[in-house]
Amino acid sequence: MTSTVITGIGELTTNDDELGKLTDAALVVEDGRIAWIGPSTAAPAADERFDAEGRAALPGWVDSHTHLVFAGDRTAEFAARMDGKPYEAGGIAVTVEATRAATDAELAANLRRHIAEAAAQGTTFVETKTGYGLTVADERRAAVVAAAEADEVTFLGAHLVPPGADADEYVDLVCGEMLDAVAPHVGWCDVFCEKGAFDADQSRRVLTAAAERGLGLRVHGNQLGTGPGVALAVELGAASVDHCTYLTQSDVDALAGSATVATLLPACDLSTRQPLPDARALLDAGATVALASNCNPGSSYTSSMGFCVTTAVLQMRMTVDEAIRAATWGGARALRREAGEDAVGVLRPGARADVQVLEAPSTAWLAYRPGVPLTHTVWRKGVRVTGR
C-alpha cells in the first residue's frame, strides 16, 4: 500500500494525551495506519502528498449507535409527532414489517447507502444493530447483512416484544434459540430496557445470556423516563448505556464511578421532542460521554455526527473540544476500540488511519457555522473515501 503525507494542517486534534492539539502539523498514513505525526516542516517523504492548506483535521467520527438494517419509511409517524402526537416507540413495529418483507440484497444495499452517506460527512467507523426482524430467521439474516458492511454489529432482538407475543415467552426465545443463531455474527448484545419494552428482570436475563456466549453488553436506557436502565448497565459492566435522557443523581454518580459510557443521542431527543440529556452534569461528575447519531427510520433519521456535535455545543453546554472527543474517542470507548492496536477515535502512530479534514481553519467552526457542510476530505483505513 502506498504512503500518504497530509501536510499543512492548520489545527490537528489528535485525542492523544501526549500529542494533544497541534498547529502547522502533518501526519503520514501507511498500510492503513498512522505512521507519523509532527510539525509540517519535519514531515517525511511519502508516495503521495495532500496539502490541507491550513484546514483543521481530526479523527473520523465514530458512530457507536445506529439501526441501519431496515426497510421502509416512517415519514407519516414523524409528521404526526411534529403535530403533537407523543413518541412511545410503537412505530418500531412498522419497520419490523417492512424489514421482514425486504430481501437480503435490498437490506444490504440500504445499509451500504447509509454508511456511504455517513462517510461523506466524516464518519469512518460505524456500529449498527439488528432489531427489526424479531424472529430467529430475520434476526440472523440482519446480523449476517450487518457483519458484511459495518465495523461493529450488535444483536438487538430485545428491541420490542412482537405484536401478539407473550413477553416472557419472547424473552425465552431471545435468550435461547435467537442468541444461538446470531452470536457467531455479532460482537455485542443490546436490550431496550424501558417501560413498554423490557423491564429490568427481562433485560437482565437477556444480557446475562449474551455474556455467557461471550458477547459484550450494551443497554438502551432512560430514554422515555427515569428507570432501571443505567443501574442495570453499571451492575452488569455494560460498555455503554445509550440515551440517558432522564437521569437521577444516583444514575449520574453510578456512571461516574464506573467504566460504562453514557452515550447521548441528541438527534433522537430533538426528533421525539424530548429534553436533551444533561451532558454537563455527566462530564462534571467524571463520567465518560459519547455522542452518536442513533440513525434509524423512526426516531432519528440522520447520519450526521456533525449535527450531533453542533447540538451538543449549542444546546447541551458541552465545549467544542468535549463534543468532538465524545463523537470520536468517546464512541470508540463505548465500543472498547479506543486503545491498543488498530485503535479508532484517536490519531497517533499505530492507530487506524481514519482522518477527516474540514473546510475550516478550526474545529470550532463545527458549532460556529451550524448547518454548513464542512467535511472536505476523509480517509478511512488510510484510503481516501471522499474529498473535494
Curated annotation (Swiss-Prot):
| Protein's cellular compartments | Cytoplasm
Q: Which cysteines are joined by disulfide bonds?
A: none
Q: Which residues bind Zn(2+)?
A: H65, H67, H220
Q: EC no.? A: 3.5.2.7
Pfam families given for it? Amidohydro_1
Binding residues for N-formimidoyl-L-glutamate: Y132, N296, G298
Q: What InterPro entries does this protein's entry cite? A: Amidohydro-rel (IPR006680), HutI (IPR005920), Metal-dep_hydrolase_composite (IPR011059), Metal_Hydrolase (IPR032466)
Task: Name the cofactor(s).
Answer: Zn(2+); Fe(3+)
Q: How is the cofactor bound?
A: Binds 1 zinc or iron ion per subunit.
Listed under catalytic activity are: 4-imidazolone-5-propanoate + H2O = N-formimidoyl-L-glutamate
Give an example GO biological process: L-histidine catabolic process to glutamate and formate
Report which residue ranges the record marks as coiled coil.
none
Task: Detail which positions bind 4-imidazolone-5-propanoate.
Answer: R74, Y132, H159, S299
- A GO molecular-function annotation: zinc ion binding
* Annotated residues for binding of Fe(3+): H65, H67, H220
Q: Which UniProt keywords apply?
A: Cytoplasm, Histidine metabolism, Hydrolase, Iron, Metal-binding, Zinc
The cellular component terms of Gene Ontology attached to this UniProt record, alphabetical and capped at eight, are:
cytoplasm
Pathway entry = Amino-acid degradation; L-histidine degradation into L-glutamate; N-formimidoyl-L-glutamate from L-histidine: step 3/3
Q: What does this protein do?
A: Catalyzes the hydrolytic cleavage of the carbon-nitrogen bond in imidazolone-5-propanoate to yield N-formimidoyl-L-glutamate. It is the third step in the universal histidine degradation pathway.
Q: Return the similarity comment.
A: Belongs to the metallo-dependent hydrolases superfamily. HutI family.
Record NCBIfam families: hutI
This one is known as Imidazolonepropionase
This protein's gene is called hutI
